[in-house]
A protein has these predicted regions:
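Aromatic-lined, polymer-binding surfaces characteristic
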Residues: 153-183, 225
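Extended, well-ordered alpha-helical scaffold segments
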Residues: 12-15, 19, 63, 136-151, ...
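Structural helix-adjacent loops and short alpha-helical linkers that scaffold large soluble proteins
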Residues: 127-145, 188-195, 244-248, 308, ...
Length: 484
């Protein structure tokens, strides 16, 4: 019979303590972080609205018991659901991530920090509706932005130096940990309870990357973050009851996360938690493509226009060379059959072939009917990726954080176009001035997919005015985003 020992008298692992003290005590005073988080909120909500056009996403959303409405429940943008906070977090989070079009963070581990908005927004709406019913003020959207900045920071700072993919774990583990800490603080848990909650996140069984790679790449990658951020809300609620935590969840010999799941290695950290990640986050603005391919797609679009001017088409191409960085080759350099949209949007050859044939890359282009065009697979076979060590160094340089690709297209007549090299995608911090107007256009287009012109106007009047937005109540904003 195994023994059960209560370990609450142990000191918590420093890594857990640092997360909790940051969430409770660090004051965000960066205007750049707040302004960027506002853009991030708009973009993330828009991504969720676009996902509602896809039945594969919609079938997963809503109450577990069909037709159920929870009193004072969480609203899900673009729908009329009223859900409990856990299922609300899943529905918001799954919609956000479905099309792989929300923000990105690239480091030793990659990920999409705005995935945390599923748990944050569900918690904020649920708390606020109960506050208002009790005669108390709602949380403000500034509170939501603060939570976003902190969740981004936790996920992104751990990711800077620590590769979960190299041990086969999916990056949504960091969504679970970051969301747990932030939503627990939003709920008003004590420091001890938040420590317990974060430890519970680390001792959970963690998602494997199985569903992101050949031969099993599939649609779970589109709802994995929704699952993680909703699990975070559940763990925070469990901790709120007074349930115990596990102080050495990371460092316990044999049974802790490091020994079980991280090959005995401990996390290393490049910088303390502040607001660095939100300030430097990457937005997917132009194309719904895995971020390591964004600059390659942009280069392919430029080459397509030159091909048109030269009177050439994709059937005239003999070879395509792509100079790229190591992470791109490791994650999205694929040969062979691609079985579904989730497989295609993580294959650089597919994402370059489509714009060279059609002069576009949209979410629809990953669907089966488009993929059936034989020209796509024929062109994929002609694409060769090769690592450029300088691109890899600049990818990891914290002052550059480039995501460079260089594309050259060779033709059967011996001519060529390129090389076209692009270091930074439109959504990069170094191209913010160029990118933000395009991001707002993306948001407006996504609003138009769901709302009437009058509804769009009301939403834009509030959400696109930064000062009005940050002072607005969560319930006011969420009520605007409900599908009437």
């Amino acid at each position: 019979m195994s023994s059960n020992v209560t370990t609450n008298n142990l000191p918590f692992d420093k890594e857990i303590v640092d997360i909790v003290d940051y969430v409770l005590n660090f004051k965000i005073d960066s205007e750049l972080a707040y302004k960027t988080s506002w853009y991030c909120f708009l973009d993330t909500i828009g991504c969720g609205l676009e996902s509602l056009e896809y039945d594969a996403c919609k079938k997963l959303l809503g109450p577990i018991v069909p037709g159920q409405k929870v009193p004072l429940g969480v609203r899900v943008p673009g729908t009329n659901f009223e859900l409990d906070p856990v299922q609300g977090a899943f529905s918001i989070g799954a919609a956000i991530r479905w099309l792989d079009f929300n923000d990105t963070w690239l480091a030793a581990e990659w990920g999409h920090p705005s995935d945390n908005l599923g748990g944050i927004l569900a918690t904020a709406d649920w708390l606020s509706r109960h506050f208002v019913a009790e005669g108390k003020p709602s949380l403000s959207m500034k509170d939501v932005l603060t939570a976003m900045i902190k969740a981004h920071e936790i996920q992104g700072c751990i990711a800077l130096e620590n590769s979960f993919n190299k041990v086969g774990l999916d990056h949504v583990i960091l969504v679970k940990v970051a969301s747990t800490a932030v939503v627990a603080a939003m709920m008003g848990l004590t420091r001890e309870q938040i420590l317990n909650a974060v430890s519970l996140a680390w001792v959970d069984g963690q998602s494997l990357r199985t569903y992101r790679h050949f031969p099993n790449a599939g649609s779970r990658k589109s709802w994995a973050a929704g699952d993680a951020t909703s699990r975070a809300v559940r763990l925070a609620l469990i901790a709120q009851t007074g349930e115990m935590g596990y102080p050495t969840a990371l460092t316990a010999r044999t049974w802790g996360f490091y020994d079980v799941s991280f090959k005995g290695e401990k996390f290393t950290f490049q910088r303390p938690y502040s607001s660095y990640v939100m300030e430097n986050v990457l937005f997917k603005i132009s194309y719904p493509a895995e971020f390591h391919a964004q600059t390659a797609v942009e280069a392919a679009m430029k080459i397509y226009r030159e091909m048109q001017n030269a009177g050439k088409n994709s059937e005239d191409i003999s070879r395509i060379d792509i100079r790229t960085h190591e992470a791109c080759i490791r994650i999205i350099d694929k040969k062979g059959p691609l079985r579904n949209p989730a497989d295609r949007d993580h294959t650089i050859q597919y994402m370059v072939a489509v714009p060279l044939i059609f002069g576009r890359l949209t979410a629809r282009d990953y669907e089966d009917d488009i993929a059936a065009d034989p020209r796509i697979d024929a062109l994929r076979e002609k694409i060769v990726c090769k690592e450029d060590p300088e691109f890899t160094r600049d990818y990891h340089d914290p002052e550059k954080r480039s995501i460079a690709n260089a594309v050259t297209v060779h033709f059967t007549d011996g001519s060529s176009i390129g090389e076209i090299a692009i270091e930074y995608p439109v959504g990069h911090k170094r191209r913010r001035e160029e990118g933000m107007p395009l991001l707002l256009e993306k948001f407006k287009k996504n609003l138009s997919r769901v709302f009437s012109p009058a509804e769009q106007s009301a939403i834009e009047n509030l959400l696109l005015d930064y000062d009005r937005f940050t002072s607005a109540s969560v319930t006011e904003v969420m009520d605007l985003l409900v599908k009437k």
